[in-house]
């Protein structure tokens, strides 16, 4: 099954983009986009990354200091998927970000900037001391934006943002 995922017109990205945890209605489109990035991934493995957690339960997870993981998507109001990333927080106060996928040349900088804001906000909400972003190549355009947000390279494929003073 082929899913049309590349914005054809700049006006498609000018509408409000929502950064939310993936819902049940977004599984098919999000999985198709994820498979383009990781073609060997099966649906079962993809769903293991997803916690089906509402944003309201996030604060409950933070209070209980349990492990939390989810797939976060960027979508427009008409449910067009603009990008995704997976995140995992553990009780060691680390937020781990993997699999940042933002296809197409149109609007991807806007989506990445909103992802960065969301990542930092969720790290603060979960009271994490560090955010580690994996699978980032040295000359990747993602890395430039993340480094502008304060990320430091700790190894060739990982950036880290320190949230504690």
Regions found by a protein language model. Name each.
Residues 4-41:
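A short beta-loop-alpha structural element at the N-terminal edge
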Residues 38-60:
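Conserved GNAT-fold acetyl-CoA-binding loop/helix
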Residues 59-73:
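A short helix-loop-beta-strand connector motif used in the catalytic cores of GNAT acetyltransferases and
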Residues 73, 79-88, 96:
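Conserved beta-strand in the GNAT
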Residues 92-105:
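Conserved acetyl-CoA binding element of GNAT-fold acetyltransferases
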Residues 107-121:
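Conserved acetyl-CoA-binding loop-helix of GNAT-fold acetyltransferases
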Residues 132-143, 160:
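Conserved beta-strand-loop-alpha-helix junction that forms the acyl-donor binding cleft
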Residues 138, 149-165:
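C-terminal "cap" of GNAT-fold acetyltransferases
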């Amino acid at each position: 099954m082929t899913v049309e995922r590349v914005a054809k017109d700049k006006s498609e990205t000018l509408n409000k983009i929502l950064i939310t945890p993936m819902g049940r209605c977004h599984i098919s489109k999000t999985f198709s986009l994820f498979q383009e990035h990781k073609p060997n991934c099966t649906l079962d493995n993809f769903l293991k990354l997803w916690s089906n957690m509402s944003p309201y339960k996030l604060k409950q997870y933070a209070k209980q200091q349990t492990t939390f993981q989810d797939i976060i998507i960027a979508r427009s109001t008409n449910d067009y998927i603009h990008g995704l990333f997976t995140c995992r927080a553990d009780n060691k106060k680390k937020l781990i970000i993997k699999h940042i996928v933002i296809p197409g040349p149109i609007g991807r900088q806007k989506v990445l900037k909103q992802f960065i804001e969301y990542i930092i906000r969720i790290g603060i909400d979960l009271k994490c001391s560090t955010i580690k972003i994996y699978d980032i190549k040295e000359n990747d355009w993602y890395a430039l934006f993340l480094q502008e947000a304060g990320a430091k390279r700790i190894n060739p494929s990982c950036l880290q943002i320190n949230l504690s003073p």
